[in-house]
């Protein structure tokens, strides 16, 4: 585990991808790129890039045989920039969905998003998240479901209208 008291104290890259366990291969592409740049943990005989990966299960979206691989992980490194990352259905967010409790037909698109804040002295703290939830996305201030499993009888209702969402917690209780 990555911990300040352990031998390896630095991460050289982080890989977020879809593809279930197959998507882990994308991290090896990032490792190859970083190795070529001379980055990595020095183990005397080589430098080993430390690239933790977080992978989403999204095989039910699109074709299950199309998934991230080492070449895509390498290409992602080549495409990296200092610009803000794309949000929505890009990268790891491509196949992300929310509200799957009633099946994929009632689910909604999830995605990827990021935020950052400068906390002073030039220190910038950032976060990136890929939302691929089985249940609902709930506004913590109001408790209102803002994305999730859609009721089968949606009809002409607008998103967020009463009856539009099937409350995952209620579905689980029944």
Language-model-detected regions and their locations in the chain:
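Active-site-adjacent structural elements in enzyme catalytic domains
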Residues: 32-34
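A structural signal for small-residue-enriched, beta-sheet-centric alpha/beta enzyme cores
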Residues: 1-21, 25, 36-174
């Amino acid at each position: 585990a990555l911990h300040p008291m352990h031998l390896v104290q630095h991460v050289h890259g982080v890989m977020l991808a879809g593809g279930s366990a197959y998507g882990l291969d994308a991290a090896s592409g990032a490792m190859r790129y970083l190795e070529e740049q001379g980055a990595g943990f020095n183990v005397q005989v080589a430098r080993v890039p430390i690239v933790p990966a977080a992978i989403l299960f999204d095989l039910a979206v699109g074709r299950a045989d199309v998934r991230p691989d080492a070449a895509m992980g390498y290409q992602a490194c080549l495409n990296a920039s200092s610009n803000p990352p794309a949000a929505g259905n890009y990268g790891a967010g491509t196949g992300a969905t929310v509200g799957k409790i009633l099946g994929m037909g009632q689910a909604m698109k999830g995605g990827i998003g990021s935020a950052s804040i400068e906390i002073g002295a030039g220190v910038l703290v950032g976060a990136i998240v890929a939302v691929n939830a089985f249940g609902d996305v709930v506004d913590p201030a109001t408790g209102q479901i803002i994305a999730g499993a859609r009721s089968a009888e949606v009809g002409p209702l607008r998103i967020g209208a009463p009856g539009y969402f099937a409350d995952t917690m209620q579905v689980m209780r029944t």
